[in-house]
Design a protein with these regions (language model features):
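Extracytoplasmic/secreted envelope proteins and their assembly/folding machinery
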Residues: 38, 42, 74, 113-120, ...
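Active-site-adjacent mobile loop/cap segments within catalytic or ligand-binding domains
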Residues: 4-6, 12-19, 75, 80, ...
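Loop/turn elements at helix/coil->beta-strand transitions in domains of secreted/extracellular proteins
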Residues: 1, 45-53, 80-85, 130, ...
């Protein structure tokens, strides 16, 4: 199985959501968390026999108009012929006490929804996070412009202190859960 991993945001141009310490200084960035989880998930998937390609960029499609970032994530995944696509992110909800994990797919009843369900179940079961469920988000670029089953994982709320601590210390647990979700999806599809 060919798995395309897209850690969310960009290390240089758009760090995504952040967590700040008691002094108001940024101590955790979404792009860093996603990159670390993605790299570990890649290792676990390769150990399970998957071919894995990973690209972290905020250039999602060729029409994104980022001339300084020539490779577009969705186009690269499509051209490579990935069997599944997983985008890894951290959620944020400034000014609220939101917590937990949710996974987004393009539409209900699709292979992308099945992939999202398998990853969501593994993350909630392994990390005991609040289960915010699988949600349909057809407007998201990485779900709309990929040719293969795709999902976007919101691991936890980076701006919630308790979730931020889990993100800070649980990289490996998140990565293992994502990898197991992908292999659970693969096993389900093979059994059909």
């Amino acid at each position: 199985m060919k798995v395309y991993i897209n850690p969310g945001h960009d290390l240089e141009y758009d760090s995504g959501a952040i967590h700040t310490d008691g002094n108001g200084d940024v101590d955790l960035r979404e792009c860093d968390v996603a990159a670390r989880i993605g790299a570990l998930a890649k290792q676990y998937l390769e150990a399970a026999g998957c071919q894995v390609r990973m690209l972290q960029s905020d250039n999602l499609c060729n029409d994104s108009e980022y001339s300084d970032r020539p490779v577009a994530v969705c186009d690269d995944a499509n051209d490579w012929g990935a069997d599944v696509f997983v985008s890894i992110h951290c959620n944020a909800c400034a000014g609220h006490d939101a917590r937990g994990t949710e996974t987004w797919c393009y539409a209900e009843g699709t292979d992308g929804a099945l992939l999202a369900e398998k990853i969501q179940a593994q993350m909630v079961g392994s990390l005991d996070t609040t289960d915010r469920g699988v949600k349909v988000m057809p407007g998201l670029m990485v779900l709309k412009h990929t040719d293969m089953p795709a999902c976007l994982v919101e691991t936890a709320f980076i701006d919630n202190d308790a979730d931020a601590e889990l993100l800070r210390t649980g990289y490996d647990d998140f990565a293992r859960a994502i990898a197991r979700g992908v292999t659970d999806y693969q096993q389900t599809k093979m059994a059909q």
